[in-house]
Every structure is written in C-alpha cells, then in structure tokens.
Amino acid sequence: MADHIDVPTALGDNAARQLANATKTVPQLSTISPRWLVHLLQWLPVEAGIYRLNKVKNPRDVRVACSQRDESELPQTFVDYDEAPREYFLNAVTTILDVHTRVSDLYSSPHDQIKEQLRLTVETIKERQESELINNPDYGLLANVSDEQRISTLTGAPTPDDLDDLITKVWKEPGFFLAHPLAIAAFGRECTRRGVPPPTVSLFGSQFLTWRGIPLIPSDKVPVEDGKTKILLLRTGEKRQGVVGLFQPGLAGEQSPGLSVRFMGINRNAIASYLISLYCSLAVLTEDALAVLDDVEIGKYHDYPDTYK
C-alpha cells in the first residue's frame, strides 16, 4: 500500500514568517543596576577639577560664655582653620568606543547602532563610577572611614543591635544604610528571628527595608570576601556637612553632569572612534558623616520548629 502523503491546503507558519517583521529589542545588559548611591548623593560642581575641603582646627577651643547678669569679663576667642586642607582631585572613568562605519551605515534600522553602542558603554562606565565611589583607595567611602567610626558586629550576623550601634556613630541626621543585598537579607533573617520584621518604605518607585526609619539601600559594589561584608551609614548633603559627590561642569561634549562623549574621527580602516569620559570624586565633609559596620557575616541561617502539626 502506498504511503499517504499530506498535501498542504493552506500557507504554513514557517513560510508565512518569512514575510513577517519581528519586533526586536535593544540589547539587554545584565550588569546594569539601579545605582541608588549615585541618586542619593548631592553632587557639587567643582572648578578646575579640584575640591579643597577646609576644616576648623581644634573646634573645642572656641570659647563662649553664658552671661550671669554681672560684669564678669567675657571670653575672647577666634576660630582657626587647618593650614593644609585636603584637596580632592576628580577621577576619570574613561574608554574609547570603536564602531565600524559599515556596521553603522547598513545595520541601523530599527535601532541605531552607534546610539546603542554608546548607551551600553555609558551604562558600564556608570557602573564603574559607583564601584569607585565605594571602593576607590583614595576617595572611596570604605577608604575614608575614620577609626573612631568603625565598629564590629556583636555575633557575626548583622543584628538590630549592630545597626543601633551604627546609628550612634552617625546620629546627626543619618541618611541611609548602604549594604550588599546579601547583607540586607542577613539582617532581615536576624530581625525575623527576633520577631521584629523591619518596615518598608517606597523610594524611587521601589520598596526598601528600613531600620529606625532609615532605609537600607542595596548595592552589589560593596565587597564580599570570605562570606563577610560591610554595612555603611551615611549622612549626605553639603548643608548637613555630610558626604557629597563631585563632578566637573561644562565639559566639551557633555551629555550629563560630568559625562562627556566626543567624536575622535575615522581612521584608515573606516572605524569611527568616540572618547567617553566620566569625571567624578567623593568627599566626606566631616568624620561623623560616615560609619561602617565591619565583619558582617552573610551565611547565617536559623531553623524554626514546625508548629503547625
């Protein structure tokens, strides 16, 4: 008996797709994060890439008196300044982006190849910027915590008592905690263990855990080594004498504060080059604007008895 052969009676899917237009997304970059630290800092423009931080010398030597309704002699005083204040110099996060003109000429529909290459490169530069704000050995947050503002955990895992102790170090208008997401999860477990689940607050359209009304801001740029990390507490703003970000205004090819994109030309291989630079730094105006909780263990879990039998 002859094999039965199916004869199509209508146009098939595979053939029909040849006439259809697929909706194409722009390239998705998994390393992009919200970069909350950059959003929460106050950014100050600097002149010539230099920020000089003047401080009062021996502030407790300034003498004042409360009048006792008599003719006693009033104190004489003056406020002295440091003669060698620290100067912060802007740091550059930079790269050169190369795009072949053939690629940008032929394959820029529906998405502009140059625009997408620039967007993805700028996002990567901004991620590096946040990492430098935390980890840079010169101006980063972790490198600028004074010894008096460092404490260690009581038992290893971050407990409510640890964060309370941290608040005592930055008690004047604390802004937010900054921690790795794993550290925030570890703190949440310790709160659950004690029956005090932390409340949440909505910022920038996202939900954040809080402690004593202070939000815990996550950043994957806070280092984790050997199962341990750190939790920082910041006060921000120039008027509060807190932590501030620094940038250079008025750059050639400025795209956003401190970010410059400049066309460098086309070489003999028909490759167009773009110089992308982001100039930034960070300053801690007073020592009590920043504190850190060291030796935070992130791998501690708890077993709970089954009470639902």
Task: Give names to the regions the model predicted.
Residues 2-84, 286-288:
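N-terminal "assembly arms/tails" that initiate or stabilize quaternary assembly
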Residues 63-79, 111-118, 140, 194, ...:
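Short charge-dense sequence patches
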Residues 75-81, 86-101:
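Intrinsically disordered, low-complexity linker/loop segments enriched in Gly/Pro
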Residues 94, 98-173:
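Alpha-helical scaffold segments that mediate packing/assembly in large oligomeric complexes
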Residues 95, 173-175, 212, 272:
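Structural beta-strand/beta-sheet cores of well-ordered domains, especially the beta-sheet scaffolds
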Residues 102, 178-183, 235, 286:
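Helix N-cap / beta->alpha transition motif
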Residues 145-208:
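Extended, solvent-exposed, turn-rich assembly/linker loops in the middle of proteins
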Residues 199-309:
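Sequence/fold signature of self-assembling virion shell proteins
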